[in-house]
Amino acid sequence: MERNTKAVIFNAIGILATVFILVSGPIVTPTVLYILIQVFGLLLIIWALIAIKVSKKHTRHALPEGYFLITKGPYEIVRHPVYAGFLLIMVSIVEIEFTFLRLVALLILCGAILMKILREEHTMTEEVHEYKEYKEKTKAIIPYLL
């Protein structure tokens, strides 16, 4: 199967899992902890997008001419802060009203995101020489762990 076809499939699976999680139960909670987790996840996403914008580069798989690796801001903490923030939000939403089906959807979403990460990192390792060193010193999604 072609790489682009795989990417479309993983994106579709991730979107379907996300939609299922969002429509299968409440997404808003009066619990302060879940609100804080969701806000933190959203702020992490915004911070990462600002870091990309400030560097005036984007993160498409086909790297633009003159691309350089972004290692400042949230990218000093994890290699994929947008995915990390999104997963924080989705985990907290599943926890609001935990069901087996929502857990399965969350695991499917995590698998789809993992496949996207592996694809992105393969491209980055091939095309950006300093990425291997960056990868060795910075965790993918969870600081100090993963």
Task: Identify the residue ranges that each predicted region occupies.
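Membrane-anchoring alpha-helices and their flanking helix-loop junctions
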Residues: M1-T71, L88-L146
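Histidine-centered phosphotransfer motif of kinases
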Residues: K72, E76-A84
